Amino acid sequence: MIQGIHYLDSLLDEMAVKWPDNRIVNIVCHGHSVPSGYFATPFVNTFDAYPHLLHKMIKERFPFAVVNVIVTAKGGENSPHGADRFEKDVLTHNPDVLIIDYCLNDRFCGLAASRMAWEQMIKQSLERDIKVILCTPTWEKAYFEQNENWKMLVQHTEQVRELADYYSVGLADSFAAYERHVKDVMDLSKYLSHVNHPSREGHMLVAQEIAKYFIAR
């Protein structure tokens, strides 16, 4: 079962504690160019990308918490490569929460290889009592073409939803958020900064999806 909005309750209780009894909380965003902050490649717009937007949202809700949002994402990377460096680059930060976002690039390594890599990272995290939130993909120009790339993106979206359900972890359904908002405004271009990267508005949709797990105390 996909975890609901109370998934992080015990951590949120700790985040409401004031100095001198509070502690450092680490949230790690692991993935590809989107959490890295790439807009029109090679331009990296760190402060309009969803890890930073999420950080600001969390601090507004938890003003006494010492929270680090750490980005270990790498442009152009897929999940098998992300899994290869997972222990060295991610687990060394001792995350309380891990956010994984690889679907856009995983289309080109295939569903089976992608699933194996996501499962490896999920299992390694759960073994260490790390809370995990999986992200479905943001949309890109393949939406306009409804081509094979789009069909693959839909398949990877479904696979990530299945993984969140199977491992009983959190889900930030960016794909569904895009679907809702594009239908409302009838304009995907508002949420794109490049052919395959979100604009600030697109990143905000992802940040809001993740932030639903960080309910103010």
Please give the residue ranges for each predicted region.
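Extracytoplasmic/secreted envelope proteins and their assembly/folding machinery
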Residues: D9-L12, P51, H55, A83, ...
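Serine-esterase "nucleophile elbow" of acetyl-processing enzymes
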Residues: I2-T72, R85-N94
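Cell-envelope and extracellular/periplasmic
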Residues: I2, V34, P42, V71-E77, ...
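Solvent-exposed loop/turn segments at secondary-structure junctions
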Residues: S33-S36, G75-S79, L104-C109, T138-A142, ...
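Internal alpha/beta domain cores that form substrate/cofactor-binding pockets in large enzymes
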Residues: N26-V28, K59, F64-H93, N105-C135
